[in-house]
Amino acid sequence: FNQANITDAIQEFERTLLTPNSRFDKYLKGDETAMTADELAGYDLFKKYNCATCHVGENMGGQSYELLGIKHDYFADRGTELTIEDNGRFKETKNERDRHRSKVPGLRNVALTAPYFHDGTQATLDEIVKAMAKYEIGVDLNDQEVKQLVAFLHTLTGEYQGKLLVNDNDVH
């Protein structure tokens, strides 16, 4: 293997992950009918609560490492012993500033990727939305806000455009 082959392999893999034409994409391209009133209200809340500060870019995240529990101590509330994974980026850097700092996940197709958080403790989008509001911005969302934010997150699911990878050496 050489660097060029590895890079080509990664590029090919990434092409299989493309999921364009989400309803959110269609809305951004000018289709005002692509999203419902609740979904648009969720998008407004997403911006109001500064979610896009971390969930930014085409993939709506995945570009930075952020601290979990800025406003409340998630790990104390969880009520279980800390694990190696709870250390976040600290595992690699050994820099105390990186303890509990994890990569911000991209939100594209987030409705398909449960469970949530680095430890899988949040089983549904409703749960993760409430938890993120509490631990990251210090807000207790009401049921309507949760419903609208979750509705918006569902608009980020795109149409799968890739192809399944096939192992030619696979014996049936």
What are these regions (language model features)?
Residues 1-33:
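Extracytoplasmic redox metalloprotein regions
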Residues 22-123, 127-130, 137-139, 164-172:
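Short glycine/threonine-rich turn/loop motifs
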Residues 57, 135, 155-159:
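Generic structural signal for alpha-helix termini and adjacent loop/cap motifs
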Residues 102-105, 146-150:
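Active-site lining segments that contact anionic ligands and/or coordinate catalytic metals
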Residues 148-172:
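A cross-kingdom marker for long, charged
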